[in-house]
Amino acid sequence: LIAGLPLYRLSEIFEDVRTLAGYNAGEIQLESLKLLPGTEMRRRAEELGIRYSPLPPYEVLQTNEISVNELQTARQLSRLLDGFYNTTAWQAITRKLILDDNDFLRRFLEFLIDKNLIDQPMSLEKRGLVLYEFCSMHYPAYKIMVTIAWIEAGMSLKKKPAEKVKTKRQMPPEYWEVIYGNYKESLRLCFLPIDDNTQNGYWFGFESEIQKAEPVFKAKGIMERCQNTQSPQINTDKSS
């Protein structure tokens, strides 16, 4: 996406981001238009209503359709996309929020600006903490997804996004639906409940013998056995 193109409004940029997210784009790049010397668009800049910087990199400053402040918003939106959507760990939850709520991008952008974070370099962990804080305030139903992303990114289970995770002496349930990996008794389990039913939630298994922060096993606990579910004991026998 290119902000500053003739006839291209800020509202359309937000719409196009949502469209690309709907197509499961691996990355969404948003850049500012630059009018390089010798190009046709630079020669027609006045005709097209484009004002641009006379100094390199010759970025567009304003058009008939997008103001100086709106171009600044587009630049900040680009930062948001790079930090969250274009980062594997946070892409799935960011995509879901973009698609589920038309106002998410503007609300999250406003949050990052108010916190003076939009132009600050943030570690992977910091971005997860920020996203969890934001969802806790504005999208509490999505906190569980942020926590799952946090765990699968190998983040600390002692930090706020993992506040609901149970780690001590966790034993597998009678039945679960395996999402990935193979269960074995040597795995260190943690459990993320999704409601008051202690069996309803997600199980993650970590290798105890190797220094690997990411889980190697994931399953969803269920109340009774049905198709596509396994007993941990049966699965253990197969993998031992």
Report each predicted region and the residues it spans.
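A structural motif corresponding to the C-terminal lobe/cap of the Radical SAM core domain
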Residues: 1-102
